[in-house]
Curated annotation (Swiss-Prot):
Subcellular location: Cytoplasm
Known catalytic reactions: (2R,3S)-3-isopropylmalate + NAD(+) = 4-methyl-2-oxopentanoate + CO2 + NADH
Pathway the protein takes part in: Amino-acid biosynthesis; L-leucine biosynthesis; L-leucine from 3-methyl-2-oxobutanoate: step 3/4
The protein, known as: 3-isopropylmalate dehydrogenase
Amino-acid positions noted as binding Mg(2+) in the UniProt annotation, renumbered to this chain: D219, D243, D247
Keywords (A to Z) from UniProt: Amino-acid biosynthesis, Branched-chain amino acid biosynthesis, Cytoplasm, Leucine biosynthesis, Magnesium, Manganese, Metal-binding, NAD, Oxidoreductase
Binding locations of substrate: R96, R106, R134, D219
Subunit and interaction comment: Homodimer.
Lineage of source species: Bacteria, Bacillati, Bacillota, Bacilli, Bacillales
Name of the top EC class for this enzyme: oxidoreductase
An example Gene Ontology molecular-function term: NAD binding
Length: 366
């Protein structure tokens, strides 16, 4: 298989971790007789510095022609005082919108060898294994008007029926191939948009009689995530709620440095990135955890290229590294081997080409 991948290092630790993912993908291509080509472009703060905009036209053009996109991270205090249209985050929001990447998938699965790192008790978090599906291109982040007024401010939450239907269908499809349980999160006791959301979920449920559906208000869902995370299989929700809940859920694993994500459109084009931010405080120090970026590459192989075995090979290699005791600073414990970005990447590369030491291959993150 031959595929062309756009690399968007972005800001902070983005370049360090995206280089790690590129090395692992190159190793996988060699092992499985694929050919991956790479092309790098700017986004976020680095694009502002070089081109005067967080999302250059050449970046959008290249991404629109690619088979998939890997993004490191965007943002940093250097650009915090910029006007809103010149903030790094506008580059990420813009590329999602322009490419029509409407579905954000964030798998959250605790890893047995890292249970110590979770802030929750082991008996609460040990069975957590969920997929959060967040609508990405509608809602209050994109509604108009959004502006300051003479005496205040206005933001607008708006959704079309089509926007809700397509993300809800994605949720049902994901639940159907997992544990057949879909939780829809809304605020239907207050918001008109949520009332329509809930109506559409009920309508679509008739097409998926094999999937059990329940509805939770967003505040109740937030509580249940930390009191009974094993309750959830697939969560589907709108943009703002999904943004907050997915960040909350990411804490269950003990480190943002372990969590990948995918932003997809209907034809399979996807942008893949770690959940964590740009971590400017450790940029250039060689200590960033590359595993979320590497696991994001695994998601890319599975969802955009259909290379399930290759994706599982990466997941197995990451799992074996952890079982061997390799940990970056964010997940380090006494008795383990604390390593930096390069050493952890090298350990993954070593495990990609060796037989698993674990009793069973780790399950897919989705």
């Amino acid at each position: 298989m031959e595929k062309h991948i756009i690399l968007l290092p972005g800001d902070g630790i983005g370049r360090e971790i995206i280089d790690s993912a590129k090395q692992v993908l190159t190793a996988i291509a060699s092992e499985y007789n694929h050919r991956f080509t790479f092309e790098e472009h700017a986004i976020g703060g680095s694009a502002i510095d070089e081109y005067g905009t967080p999302l250059p036209d050449k970046t959008v053009d290249a991404c629109s022609k690619a088979d998939a996109i890997l993004l490191g991270a965007v943002g940093g205090p250097k650009w915090d005082a910029n006007p809103s249209h010149l903030r790094p985050e506008k580059g990420l929001l813009g590329i999602r919108k322009q490419l029509g990447l409407f579905a954000n998938l964030r798998p959250v699965k605790t890893i047995s060898s890292l249970l110590y790192a979770s802030p929750l008790k082991e008996e609460i978090v040990s069975q957590a294994d969920m997929l959060i599906i967040r609508e990405l291109t509608g809602g209050i982040y994109f509604g108009t008007p959004s502006e300051r007024t003479t005496n205040g401010v206005v933001d607008t939450l708006q959704y079309s029926r089509e926007e809700i239907e397509r993300i809800v269908e994605r949720g049902f499809e994901a639940a159907r191939i997992r544990k057949k349980h879909l939780t829809s999160v809304d605020k239907a006791n207050v918001l008109e948009s949520s009332k329509l959301w809930r109506e559409i979920v009920e309508e679509k449920s008739k097409d998926y009689p094999d999937v059990a559906v329940n509805h939770l208000l967003v505040d109740a869902a937030a509580m249940k995530l930390v009191t009974q995370p094993s309750f959830f299989d697939v969560i589907v929700t709108e943009n703002l709620f999904g943004d907050i809940l997915s960040d909350e859920a990411s804490v269950l694993t003990g480190s943002l440095g372990m969590l990948p994500s995918a932003s997809l459109r209907a034809d399979g084009l996807g942008l893949y990135e770690p959940v964590h931010g740009s971590a400017p405080d450790i940029a250039g120090k060689g200590i960033a955890n590359p595993l979320a970026m590497i696991l994001s590459a695994a998601l890319m192989l599975e969802h955009s290229f259909g290379l399930v075995d290759e994706a599982k090979e990466i997941e197995r290699a990451v799992n074996d590294c952890l079982l061997q005791g390799f940990h970056t600073a964010d997940i380090h414990i006494p008795g383990g081997v604390q390593v930096g970005t390069k050493q952890m990447t090298d350990a993954v590369l070593e495990n990609v080409t060796t037989k698993s030491i674990s009793d069973s291959i780790c399950s897919s993150y989705v």
